[in-house]
């Protein structure tokens, strides 16, 4: 019985971390797209501050980076390992939970979870996130959708 509870716990957290990564990617994408609209720099910064506030990460961010700016918020929310809510941190935690119950997962679920983590890590290492194109969030988000669908 203990083994079933542990498996259920890992599956719950795998899904929860995957969902959190997806939600963060969506919020970043919406904020990025909004920042492209004609507006003052002050209004754009309010959007980035709002994103941090919604995520309850504004104090942690300002401790590390000080003033809010789009580039630092993106890096903090996508790849900063000191941020447990960053996309990379969430995908790493989801992958570790999936790995812990690898024997109970279908091959498709494991491969999708692992491939998503590998792809995002590759994008971060190649600095595609910094130069960020629409495709970056779209491809990451579609991989996460596939994890949920499988």
Enumerate the predicted regions with their spans.
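Alpha-helical transmembrane segments and their helix-helix packing motifs
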Residues: 1-150
């Amino acid at each position: 019985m203990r083994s079933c509870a542990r498996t259920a716990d890992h599956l719950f957290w795998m899904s929860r971390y995957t969902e959190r990564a997806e939600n963060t990617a969506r919020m970043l994408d919406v904020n990025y797209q909004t920042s492209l609209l004609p507006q003052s720099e002050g209004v754009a910064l309010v959007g980035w501050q709002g994103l941090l506030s919604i995520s309850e990460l504004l104090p942690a961010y300002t401790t590390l980076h000080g003033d809010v700016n789009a580039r630092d918020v993106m890096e903090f929310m996508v790849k900063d390992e000191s941020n447990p809510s960053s996309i990379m941190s969430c995908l790493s935690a989801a992958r570790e939970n999936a790995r812990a119950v690898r024997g109970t997962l279908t091959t498709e679920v494991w491969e999708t979870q692992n491939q998503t983590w590998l792809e995002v890590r590759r994008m971060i290492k190649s600095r595609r996130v910094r130069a960020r194109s629409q495709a970056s969030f779209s491809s990451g988000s579609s991989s996460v959708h596939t994890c949920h669908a499988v």
